[in-house]
């Protein structure tokens, strides 16, 4: 058991027998009335997102979540195969659970796999990853002054928007939460 004051992003709550991951939370102390916590929760099984408000200090039941570092091996067409880096056990994960993480997964890349009672809940990637641009229209000299963007395909096949001066073959840093371009990788 925890209270709403202990909430953190990524924490998993057991509400009415269903598991919900905390996506966002905000403690609100209005000028008049008691403080409360506004949250955005994502159902671990259905991926449905809801907004829920709790009174500050309300007790909530937390789910026991085991987070293990695993290495992504390959996609066999029907599932994504990960390997535990300590025990070398392999685990097949359904595409629905992998979700948007598939857009940033490269073979041999490490990720955190969260499980509850042996069931995979979700995959956590680092906040940003470095990926190579495999296709984009060529940039023109002097295109760095404007804030305009163009589509670019990453080595994973995912398409993002990049500034006009980025060229094919360059490595870029990408935010895994919203697919936004963060910068060019030096070296």
UniProtKB/Swiss-Prot annotation:
Keyword terms of this UniProt record: Cytoplasm, Elongation factor, Protein biosynthesis
Coiled-coil annotated spans: none
InterPro entries for this protein: Elong-fact-P_C, NA-bd_OB-fold, Rib_uL2_dom2, Transl_elong_fac_P/YeiP, Transl_elong_KOW-like, Transl_elong_P/YeiP_cen, Transl_elong_P/YeiP_CS, Transl_elongation_fac_P
Pfam (any one): EFP_N
GO molecular function: translation elongation factor activity
Family under the similarity heading: Belongs to the elongation factor P family.
Protein name: Elongation factor P
Species, as recorded: Nocardioides sp. (strain ATCC BAA-499 / JS614)
């Amino acid at each position: 058991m925890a209270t709403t004051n202990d909430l953190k992003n990524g924490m998993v709550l057991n509400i009415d027998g269903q598991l919900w991951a905390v996506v966002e939370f905000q403690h609100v102390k209005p000028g008049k009335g008691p403080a409360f916590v506004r949250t955005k929760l994502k159902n671990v099984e259905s991926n449905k997102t809801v907004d829920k408000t709790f009174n500050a200090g309300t007790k909530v039941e937390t789910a026991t979540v085991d987070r293990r570092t695993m290495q992504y091996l390959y996609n066999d067409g029907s599932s994504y195969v990960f390997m535990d880096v300590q025990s070398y056990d392999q685990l097949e994960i359904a595409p629905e659970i992998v979700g948007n993480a598939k857009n940033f997964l490269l073979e041999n890349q490490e990720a955190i796999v969260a499980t509850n009672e042996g069931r995979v809940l979700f995959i956590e990637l680092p906040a940003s990853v470095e990926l190579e641009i495999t296709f984009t229209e060529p940039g023109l000299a002097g295109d760095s002054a404007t804030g305009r963007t163009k589509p670019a395909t990453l080595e994973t096949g995912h398409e993002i928007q990049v500034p006009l001066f980025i060229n094919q073959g360059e490595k870029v840093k990408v935010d895994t939460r919203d697919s936004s371009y963060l910068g060019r990788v030096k070296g």
